[in-house]
Amino acid sequence: MATQIVEDTIKSKGRRTDVGDILKPLNSEYGKVAPGWGTTVLMGIFMALFAVFLVIILEIYNASVLLDGISVSWASLV
C-alpha cells in the first residue's frame, strides 16, 4: 500500500536558548500585514537611489582609463 498510518508520537518541542528568547518578539508579528501602503514608498525611494548609484558606476566604468584607445564602435567588430 502506498500510504501508511503512523501512530501518534510525542514530538519534542526543541531546546530553549537565550538567542531564541531574544528573537521571539521579532517573530510575533509574522503573517500580519499593515493596512495601507506601509513602507512601499520608502522602498521605491531606495530603489530609485540604487538605480542612480548603478548609473553613476556605469558612467565611471565607461570613462575608465582602461577603455582609452579601444574602439567601441560596432564597425570595428566586422
Curated annotation (Swiss-Prot):
Please state the protein's primary subcellular location.
Answer: plastid
Q: Report membrane topology.
A: Single-pass membrane protein
Q: Provide a GO CC annotation, any one.
A: chloroplast thylakoid membrane
Which of the residues bear the PTM Phosphothreonine?
A: 3
Q: Which Pfam families does this one have?
A: PsbH
> What keywords is this UniProt entry annotated with?
Chloroplast, Membrane, Phosphoprotein, Photosynthesis, Photosystem II, Plastid, Thylakoid, Transmembrane, Transmembrane helix
* Residue intervals passing through the bilayer: 41-61
SUPFAM superfamilies xrefs: Photosystem II 10 kDa phosphoprotein PsbH (SSF161025)
Name one process (GO BP) from the record.
photosynthesis
Q: List the disulfide bonds.
A: none
One function term, GO molecular function aspect: phosphate ion binding
Q: How is it modified after translation?
A: Phosphorylation is a light-dependent reaction catalyzed by a membrane-bound kinase; phosphorylation occurs on Thr residue(s) in the N-terminus of the protein.
Indicate where this protein resides in the cell: Plastid, Chloroplast thylakoid membrane
Q: Which domain of life is it from?
A: Eukaryota
Q: Which function does this protein serve?
A: One of the components of the core complex of photosystem II (PSII), required for its stability and/or assembly. PSII is a light-driven water:plastoquinone oxidoreductase that uses light energy to abstract electrons from H(2)O, generating O(2) and a proton gradient subsequently used for ATP formation. It consists of a core antenna complex that captures photons, and an electron transfer chain that converts photonic excitation into a charge separation.
Its family remark reads: Belongs to the PsbH family.
Q: Subunit structure, per the record?
A: PSII is composed of 1 copy each of membrane proteins PsbA, PsbB, PsbC, PsbD, PsbE, PsbF, PsbH, PsbI, PsbJ, PsbK, PsbL, PsbM, PsbT, PsbX, PsbY, PsbZ, Psb30/Ycf12, at least 3 peripheral proteins of the oxygen-evolving complex and a large number of cofactors. It forms dimeric complexes.
Q: What's the protein called, per UniProt?
A: Photosystem II reaction center protein H
Where does this protein come from, organism-wise?
Chara vulgaris
